[in-house]
A protein has these predicted regions:
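A general structural signal for short secondary-structure junctions and capping/turn motifs
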Residues: 47-48, 69-70, 189, 200
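Catalytic core of membrane glycerolipid acyltransferases/transacylases, capturing the structured
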Residues: 51-137
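Amphipathic alpha-helical segments that form well-ordered structural scaffolds
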Residues: 30, 68, 122-126, 183, ...
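N-terminal membrane-anchoring alpha-helices
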Residues: 1-38
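Short aromatic/hydrophobic-glycine micro-motifs
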Residues: 37-41, 131-132, 242
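Helix-to-loop junction immediately C-terminal to a conserved catalytic motif
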Residues: 24, 28-62, 71
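Non-catalytic C-terminal accessory region of glycerolipid acyltransferases
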Residues: 2-15, 137-260
Length: 260
């Protein structure tokens, strides 16, 4: 076997969706699929399909987004997620009761505490299987970037849900945190020109809109701040969510013409 073929074989093994998750977790996901609660959405690509080592931006849709993408994405992926959900059972229970269910989903605090006695252990099990990349709101964010770059170099794609959900989850996204822009910028400085896919998961329509990828180098030419770039991609994400069937058909037709 030549050196090139050996490297290609090793890369394929590293990037295999089956190798990206442990055996017990793959079995756990099969069980969840049998429940048929998180159905596979129809993926609508307005450009190239997902490629390895890319950055994927998506709306959150509460727990529906991460669960659906994990169950039905064939690409080897890593998710960004708040460190509280990756720091043990006690930390996760506190976060889910006080922040997720009470503040974001507006549950009664006592109901949230009772529900999370059952929900949190199951959620922690799922998050452990995800091999989540922890995110932070302080200087520890450097760890997030470092681990994410290592994942990209292994051929894994990183999925980020950057919306500000402090007031809850909305179909029309209100703002994006700019941490993912900083990540793409750092990759670029280290010689990695990240392909960035803006996507929108439409639960009601059962569609997953995937915009044509744009490399970070193209965004850098715009001379915008991180916040401005995040807002620009936020607007595009919302546009994807509002596209009519006619607009989708037109976009796909234009893509075909460009290829020709």
């Amino acid at each position: 076997m030549s050196k090139k073929n050996k490297i290609d074989k090793e890369l394929k093994e590293v990037c295999s969706p089956r190798e990206n998750r442990k055996l017990w977790f793959r079995g756990f996901k099969k069980f969840i699929r049998l429940l048929n609660v998180y159905k596979k959405p129809e993926a609508v690509y307005l450009g190239k399909r997902f490629q390895r080592g890319s950055l994927i931006i998506s709306n959150h849709v509460g727990s529906y987004g991460p669960l659906t993408l994990e169950l039905h994405t064939e690409l080897p992926i890593r998710f960004w997620g708040t460190y509280e959900m990756n720091s043990g059972l006690r930390s996760a229970y506190k976060y889910q009761t006080n922040i997720y269910y009470h503040e974001k989903k507006c549950w009664n605090i006592h109901l949230a505490r009772l529900f999370c006695l059952i929900a949190t252990p199951i959620t922690c099990l799922f998050y452990k299987g995800l091999n989540l990349i922890s995110t932070y709101r302080d200087a520890r964010f450097v760890k997030t970037i470092h681990e994410s770059i290592n994942s990209i170099r292994r051929g894994e794609s990183v999925i980020v849900f950057p919306e500000d959900s402090s007031q809850g989850y909305f179909d029309d996204l209100r703002s994006f945190y700019a941490g993912f822009v900083m990540f793409a910028e750092t990759c670029y400085k280290r010689g990695i020109d990240l392909p960035i896919y803006v996507t929108y998961l439409n639960r009601k329509a059962g569609k997953y809109m995937v915009d044509a990828p744009v490399c970070y180098s193209e965004l850098a030419k715009l001379n915008k701040s991180r916040t401005e770039l995040a807002e620009m991609l936020l607007n595009r994400c919302n546009e994807l969510g509002k596209m009519s069937s006619g607009e989708v058909s037109q976009a796909i037709e234009e893509k075909s013409v460009k290829r020709a």
